[in-house]
């Protein structure tokens, strides 16, 4: 069966996001097949930084200024520095149409992104960001052109042939993702110790959450890789598609070596030929204590783990063990 090429690879059963702020999130995904932490981490990082869409200023027109090499009376920064500061304005904008926004201010004081008069669905995400500083009696008026796009677009590509004199193109940093780092650690799944754990830190400008950014990047990869699949998957037999109605809790089909018990407890269960949780819960405490090298400490450990699953020792399980237990375990593995 060709499906085994991908179906029998382990997939993460833990994908957790924690956010320390509006702009920063950490992803932990485990377990992954050996090497997949690096493969997925690198692919997601590159797509996150290059391919997500966002909004940015593409041009600015400053009253009384003809080109970016000018200076403005009463403004401490020259126009080149002002343009560099404009590049760092973080913007969220819905829709694909080009929009305008204006700022007008008199000195003394700083002109910040929060002073900009926005229209429609534009939101300034870093209102404290300083654009320029005015001296006493100075005045400035700027009009910004805002567009949606992806990646980085240099100012030259934002320069329209029919642009009016004084319209200064700006390098556009569209990507809402500012920084991505990741590392891969070893993790354990049952008794296997060499699976990968992917830990990724995502920093955005606030227009998208780290969790959504990863979801968008994964969807982009999914869409791009789909063109390389040159076959149709064989249809499963009808009896494989229908899930057999069980007479017991599907969690009993989980193997005891997936319970993350201590080595001593796990070895005792293995030596007593206890493979599934369904085998284990039918044992009484007295029977367990008669197992060689199995003491009260191991008993308490197992009771605590079972209790967390709503189970206990000494339970009766009808129709156990089922004839096709291995097939059932694979079929129900997503339910426990």
UniProtKB/Swiss-Prot annotation:
Protein's organism: Agrobacterium fabrum (strain C58 / ATCC 33970)
Region (Alpha C-terminal domain (alpha-CTD)): 248-336
NCBIfam families listed in its UniProt record: PRK05182.1-2, PRK05182.2-5, rpoA
GO molecular function: DNA binding; DNA-directed RNA polymerase activity; protein dimerization activity
Subunit structure as annotated in this protein's UniProt entry: Homodimer. The RNAP catalytic core consists of 2 alpha, 1 beta, 1 beta' and 1 omega subunit. When a sigma factor is associated with the core the holoenzyme is formed, which can initiate transcription.
Region (Alpha N-terminal domain (alpha-NTD)): 1-232
Keywords of the record: DNA-directed RNA polymerase, Nucleotidyltransferase, Transcription, Transferase
Gene Ontology CC terms, in alphabetical order: cytoplasm; DNA-directed RNA polymerase complex
CDD domains given in the database record: RNAP_alpha_NTD
Enzyme class per UniProt: transferase
This protein's name: DNA-directed RNA polymerase subunit alpha
